[in-house]
């Protein structure tokens, strides 16, 4: 491993597909980068990832490890790994940035790439978190194919803070779920006021089943596979579903957007400008789930490479300006 430079071209916060792809782009053009890896990933409950050519239905853990191995073997002269989280990030004195890791060590970089991902806000329903990623799916592009031919699927309307949005999602996911299951039930979790909502009545008219009863808990059969999830209702009744669909709200992982004063989108993601995904603060880029609404591995890879390219172009511009002053 080469000696760490006193100042890196980029400090990459996050070692998921976005951060690793950004590092790869930087390594290809001989830029130095430090990658901060907490080892915590949103898709940890999932055994497989999808829609990634040559890696479809394979382990996300194996994918990340292969990326890290490739970077270590081919680009160890410029790409450095720090197996620690980041405590803070701030602007330095000379148009650079300073990261303090969780061990108290400081790192300096010309640019920053946020690839921190997001955290899912789990609804306050007993058993939901345990079933998440196993029988409750937020994305049917990611998980639907493996459920094809199912007898039933349930759509959950749970988040009291965004109920109207949850109904819109249920309408969209309901029709999408029909591509994988024969019977669809919409669970309103006690929100009987939506029984008269034109969107719900429209689903009912099209053959969807509507269950307005409050949900007490969710359980699932771990064995044998394929099993089913059971929605337990407060009146004591139960409904078995081949799988459940719900997209919870997400929050940015870490306080770094706030520390840097970055603008956010209405959805709470970091606001960026294509094609290089620079944020509202010059020299700070964002990639992956924290920066795009479509939170999938392929998007993380794409935006990571774009952000890495953006860092190179800005560094190149500064290097050219410095050389011109010497001539």
Curated annotation (Swiss-Prot):
Classification via InterPro entries: FAD/NAD-bd_sf (IPR036188), FAD/NAD-binding_dom (IPR023753), Ferredoxin-NADP_redctase_2 (IPR050097)
Superkingdom per UniProt: Eukaryota
Cofactor: FAD
Disulfide bonds: 139-142
UniProt-recorded Gene Ontology molecular function terms: oxidoreductase activity
Induction entry: Expression is co-regulated with the other genes from the sirodesmin cluster and corresponds with sirodesmin production.
Co-factor remark: Binds 1 FAD per subunit.
Keyword terms, alphabetized: Disulfide bond, FAD, Flavoprotein, NADP, Oxidoreductase, Redox-active center, Virulence
Pathway involvement of the protein, from the record: Mycotoxin biosynthesis
Pfam families in UniProt: Pyr_redox_2 (PF07992)
Top-level EC class as recorded in UniProt: oxidoreductase
Binding-site positions, FAD: 15-18, 37-42, 50, 115, 289, 296-297
E.C. number: 1.8.1.-
GO biological process: cellular response to toxic substance
Entries under PANTHER family matching the protein: THIOREDOXIN REDUCTASE 1-RELATED-RELATED
Entry's family note: Belongs to the class-II pyridine nucleotide-disulfide oxidoreductase family.
Subunit and partners: Homodimer.
Record function comment: Thioredoxin reductase; part of the gene cluster that mediates the biosynthesis of sirodesmin PL, an epipolythiodioxopiperazine (ETP) characterized by a disulfide bridged cyclic dipeptide and that acts as a phytotoxin which is involved in the blackleg didease of canola. SirD catalyzes the O-prenylation of L-tyrosine (L-Tyr) in the presence of dimethylallyl diphosphate (DMAPP) to yield 4-O-dimethylallyl-L-Tyr, and therefore represents probably the first pathway-specific enzyme in the biosynthesis of sirodesmin PL.
Name of this protein: Thioredoxin reductase sirT
Source organism of this protein record: Leptosphaeria maculans (Blackleg fungus)
């Amino acid at each position: 491993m080469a000696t760490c430079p006193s100042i890196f071209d980029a400090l990459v916060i996050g070692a998921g597909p976005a951060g690793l792809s950004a590092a790869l782009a930087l390594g290809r053009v001989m830029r130095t980068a430090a990658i901060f890896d907490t080892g915590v990933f949103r898709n940890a409950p999932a055994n497989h990832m999808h829609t990634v050519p040559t890696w479809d239905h394979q382990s996300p853990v194996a994918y990340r490890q292969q990326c890290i191995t490739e970077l270590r073997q081919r680009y160890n002269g410029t790409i450095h790994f720090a197996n620690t989280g980041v405590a803070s990030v701030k602007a330095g004195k000379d148009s650079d940035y300073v990261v303090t890791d969780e061990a108290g060590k400081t790192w300096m970089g010309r640019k920053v790439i946020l690839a921190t991902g997001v955290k899912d806000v789990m609804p306050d329903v007993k058993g939901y978190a345990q079933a998440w990623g196993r029988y409750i799916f937020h994305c049917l592009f990611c998980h639907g194919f493996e459920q094809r031919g199912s007898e039933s699927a349930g759509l959950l309307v749970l988040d009291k803070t965004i109920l109207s949005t949850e109904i819109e999602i249920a309408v969209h996911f309901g029709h999408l779920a029909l591509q994988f299951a024969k019977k669809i039930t919409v669970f309103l979790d006690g929100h009987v006021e939506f029984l008269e909502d034109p969107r719900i009545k429209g689903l009912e008219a099209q053959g969807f089943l509507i269950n307005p009863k409050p949900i007490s808990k969710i359980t699932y059969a771990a064995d044998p596979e394929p099993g089913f999830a059971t929605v337990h209702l407060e009146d004591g009744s139960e409904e078995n579903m081949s799988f459940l669909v719900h997209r919870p709200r997400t929050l940015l992982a870490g306080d770094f957007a706030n520390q840097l004063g970055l603008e956010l989108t209405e959805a709470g993601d970091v606001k960026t400008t294509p094609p290089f995904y620079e944020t509202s603060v010059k020299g700070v880029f964002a990639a992956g789930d924290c920066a795009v609404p479509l939170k999938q591995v392929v998007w993380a890879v794409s935006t990571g490479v774009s952000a890495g390219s953006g860092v190179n172009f800005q560094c190149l511009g500064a290097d050219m300006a410095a050389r011109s002053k010497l001539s």
